[in-house]
Each structure stands twice: as structure tokens, then as C-alpha cells.
Amino acid sequence: MTLTIALTKGRTETQVLPLLAAAGIHCEAIQAKSRRLIFADDPNFHFILVKAPDVLTYLNHGTVDIGIVGSDILAEQGHRQFDMLDLNTGRCRFILASTADFDPKQTKRKLIATKYPHIAQQYFQKQGEDVEIIKIEGSVELAPLTGMADAIVDITETGTTLRENHLKVFAELAPVSTHLVVNRLALKQKRTEIYQLIQSLQKVRPQEASL
């Protein structure tokens, strides 16, 4: 049976394609960087390229059998499917950051800017704090620099952008990496094919390494 896979476009796509190729999947057409969004060159694996926030939408509607997406999206959106494998790529971390004069222990209600309102709210609830969340889609780093927010919750890999904007990390919330997620019905109908893919990827994925 053919497996249809939703692959996150961009950085995730670039990092995961070598793993898929090493697992024996024909990815040449995707690696050719055309404007195509659907790839059916391998009779056993069909791919669609989508934006990260849309992967779970395709998965939840049963349009695809498998989604490859960052755990940041899984944590922010929530999902009803099976998170089957950490591919150990795209590794970064959620952080709380702000300007050097920020006091995490300040008693006044904090304004927190983020692309991840659910994750930010959960973090501060665990800290016993009631905060106001400001959702931003662009450069979150601007929020504390312009005074619009007290701090930000964002993901970072190396911290370079934070340092270049004179922002300091005050807390690390959780690790982030790329995961393989399987539709519930697909796991019943295509169990053998899915587990064969997972076993192949387990052999070629990078060993887990700390940031």
C-alpha cells in the first residue's frame, strides 16, 4: 500500500530528505527544488509539501497517512494522532527571553509576546502566574525591545538572533525536534508499511545530542 506523507516545507524538508533517502525512499524530485507541491515519483511513498501549521490539518482529515513536523507545532496545536518517532533533526528549544533588566520575579502582571500562545500560557500557569499573552507572527524579538511586551516565549537553536538583539535567556521551557506523526486510521489499515518505514528511519536518524 502507498503511504502519503505531509512534509513541512523549508528547513524541516531540507533536514529530513537525507534521512528519507538513506531509508531507501526516492526523493530526487523533491530535492530538485521545483515548484511542485505533490510528488508521486516513488510508487510506495507519495509526498505533499505544506506549511508547518497545516500538517496536522491534513493528518486530522485523513488526507495523509503520516505527517513530519516539529514538536513545537504538536505542542501548540494539540492533536488526536499517534506521535510515533522523534527524528532527532531540527533540534532547538523553547525559551523565555527579554532584555537584561527584565525581572522574572516581578509581581505585576507580565505581558508576554509569542507565536505560541498555548505553550506560553501553559508555562506560566505551571509557574502559578497569570499573564497577558500577545500573539505575534513576525519577529518576536521586537516586542521587548519596543516596550510592547515584558518578555517573549520563542524557539531558538543557537541563540544568535537573541544575542544580536541584546536579549537574554531567562528560562528554558522544553526541547523541540522534528517528529513523525501517524493518522490513527492509517495505522490500522497500513500498519505493516508504517512500521517498516519507522524501523528504516530509526536506523538512519541522528543520535540524540544535547544542544
From Swiss-Prot:
InterPro entries: ATP_PRibTrfase_cat, ATP_PRibTrfase_CS, ATP_PRibTrfase_HisG, ATP_PRibTrfase_HisG_short. Its main location: cytoplasm. GO terms for molecular function: ATP binding; ATP phosphoribosyltransferase activity. Pathway: Amino-acid biosynthesis; L-histidine biosynthesis; L-histidine from 5-phospho-alpha-D-ribose 1-diphosphate: step 1/9. Catalyzes the condensation of ATP and 5-phosphoribose 1-diphosphate to form N'-(5'-phosphoribosyl)-ATP (PR-ATP). Has a crucial role in the pathway because the rate of histidine biosynthesis seems to be controlled primarily by regulation of HisG enzymatic activity. HAMAP family: HisG_Short (MF_01018). This is ATP phosphoribosyltransferase.
